[in-house]
């Protein structure tokens, strides 16, 4: 009985993991655009040395360790390190990995997922963040 429950729980967990992101990224170059500029403005005011000690978020895009791990997981290799969060170009690459794996990508979904994880687009806590991003895009 325990094994059946565990198997069902594991199956449910695995099936929800792919609901909000595409396992295969969109194969197209993604340039720096208004969304990325808005996210950098909101996250750090374009400061590559910005650091939020409370969240251990670093760099121009305020990347936390969990995001580095997630990007590496999506790429299926350890391409990025925590040190790369301080590098603007590598931070942008990580943002673009997340963006390219976002299912049904819109600026809102990408921004809210960047702020709140793969289910960020459904969290009330990311609405205020999205409003800040929209103000920057205007």
Regions found by a protein language model. Name each.
Residues 48-49, 121-124:
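Extracytoplasmic/secreted cell-surface and envelope-processing proteins
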Residues 4-14:
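Sec-dependent N-terminal signal peptides
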Residues 65-122, 130-138:
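Alpha-helical segment that forms one wall of the substrate-binding/catalytic cleft
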Residues 38-77:
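Secreted/periplasmic proteins that engage bacterial cell-wall peptidoglycan
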Residues 14-21:
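C-terminal segment of classical bacterial N-terminal signal peptides
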Residues 29-32, 54, 105-107:
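Extracellular/periplasmic catalytic domains that process cell-envelope and extracellular macromolecules
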Residues 31-47, 95, 109-118:
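Short, functionally critical alpha-helical segments immediately adjacent to catalytic or ligand/cofactor-binding
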Residues 21-28:
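Extracytoplasmic and endomembrane cell-envelope/extracellular-matrix remodeling and assembly machinery
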């Amino acid at each position: 009985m325990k094994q059946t429950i565990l198997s069902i729980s594991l199956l449910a967990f695995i099936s929800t993991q792919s609901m909000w992101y595409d396992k295969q990224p969109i194969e197209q170059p993604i340039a720096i655009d208004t969304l990325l500029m808005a996210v950098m403005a909101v996250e750090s005011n374009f400061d590559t040395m910005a650091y939020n000690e409370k969240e251990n978020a670093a760099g121009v895009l305020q990347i936390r360790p969990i995001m580095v791990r997630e990007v590496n997981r999506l790429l299926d290799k350890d391409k990025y390190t925590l040190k790369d969060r301080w590098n603007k170009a590598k931070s942008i690459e990580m943002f673009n990995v997340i963006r390219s794996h976002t299912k049904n990508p819109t600026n809102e979904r990408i921004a809210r997922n960047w702020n709140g994880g793969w289910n960020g687009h459904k969290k009330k806590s990311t609405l205020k963040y999205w409003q800040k991003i929209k103000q920057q895009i205007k």
